[in-house]
Amino acid sequence: ERRCDPRRLSDCEDFVRGRSKGGRGEKECRLSERCCTELQKMPRECRCEAVEGMYKEAERKERGEGEQRQRLERARALPGLCSIEPSYCEIRPS
């Protein structure tokens, strides 16, 4: 189902990868807001599935570089960060 496509979480992927262009702080905040908007548009029942797919795609792009644990924790906590249900996604590390 297209509405559950992990590719619809592109801002979330950037956020999980820590790709706020130009440093931390305010930009990252805006990025997380855009990510929350993407997540809210998804049907509740497939949010975690989409988040997991997005996380695996982020890992593929990063090829295990850098802060894998941090990316995993960020991905798992995304719905909670956005104050939407379910508040936590159980993602199996790749």
Curated annotation (Swiss-Prot):
Protein name: 2S albumin-like cysteine protease inhibitor
GO biological process, one term: negative regulation of endopeptidase activity
A Pfam entry, by short name: Tryp_alpha_amyl
Protein family: Belongs to the 2S seed storage albumins family.
Gene3D superfamilies on file: Plant lipid-transfer and hydrophobic proteins (1.10.110.10)
Temperature dependence: Thermostable. Active from 25 to 100 degrees Celsius. Retains 80% of its maximal activity after heating for 2 hours at 100 degrees and retains around 30% of its maximal activity after heating for 4 hours at 100 degrees.
Disulfide-linked positions: C12-C35, C36-C82, C48-C89
